[in-house]
């Protein structure tokens, strides 16, 4: 299609929460508090696992990497959301918008792969306990972690490449809280059917495939737990999976509804609500889920606090 007579949009305006203009300052304070607690919580888990030798196991190795990825995942969107809540000019450059989409989706994909790796780790620990030490070696853990990061960073390249070639001649108002594929594609001055299809296929492969692998792992885990004769043994097995399974339900419940759907239209209120869940609430809840439900992490935090003299 000839785009020679069209002027390319240089920046976008992120509308954010247009129906809540009167309470922007309160939203800012609430979001700032959530962001600070998210950063502190995930950073605490990452440092505690790194510093406490008792937590140098495959399960906590993946937990620490997940917490580290959450720091980048939230940094990709929340600081800009905070700035927009205080600013009259809620703009972002075209290249800045694409960078935000890239980092948000690459780190989100990394989280999908890490959650899958954690499910596989729990499957080996519960279903094949005798072979677990020889199967889940430190070398394999490192290789899986590197694979998760490389796969995540490479994931959005095709979609970003395609969207960067689209003409955007106006309007330039993004009806969302941050830059993302669906709301940005809706502003293109040409047919985006190919982009929507590619986005759907990639997200289906990435999100559905990892979710199904996690489900398969948990089906095997449940079958194994049901065969455990003692109630104490069943409780112990379930306790090692409860935190991870809770995170999976919250995270995948929102991203499946948002991204695994073949559509060109965009629903402001519905998609904004989902975006807040998977971009703000899930990273915020993860440290609480992993620490409050995990005695080993709570004990490790106490040991580190005693070591530096905060606790007697």
Curated annotation (Swiss-Prot):
Q: Give the UniProt subcellular location, in the record's own words.
A: Cell membrane
GO MF terms, alphabetically ordered: G protein-coupled receptor activity; olfactory receptor activity
Q: Which residues lie on this side of the membrane: Cytoplasmic?
A: 47-54, 121-139, 218-237, 293-312
The record's listing under CDD domains reads: 7tmA_OR6N-like
A Pfam family cross-referenced in the UniProt record is 7tm_4
* Signal sequence, start to end: none
Mode of membrane association: Multi-pass membrane protein
Which parts of the sequence lie on the Extracellular side of the lipid bilayer? 1-25, 76-99, 161-197, 259-271
Whether Glycoprotein counts among this entry's keywords is yes
What keywords would UniProt list here? Cell membrane, Disulfide bond, G-protein coupled receptor, Glycoprotein, Membrane, Olfaction, Receptor, Sensory transduction, Transducer, Transmembrane, Transmembrane helix
Question: Its GO CC terms?
Answer: plasma membrane
Question: Where are the glycosylation sites?
Answer: 5
Chain ranges passing through the membrane: 26-46, 55-75, 100-120, 140-160, 198-217, 238-258, 272-292
For this chain, the family text in UniProt reads: Belongs to the G-protein coupled receptor 1 family.
Describe its function: Odorant receptor.
Entry protein name: Olfactory receptor 6N1
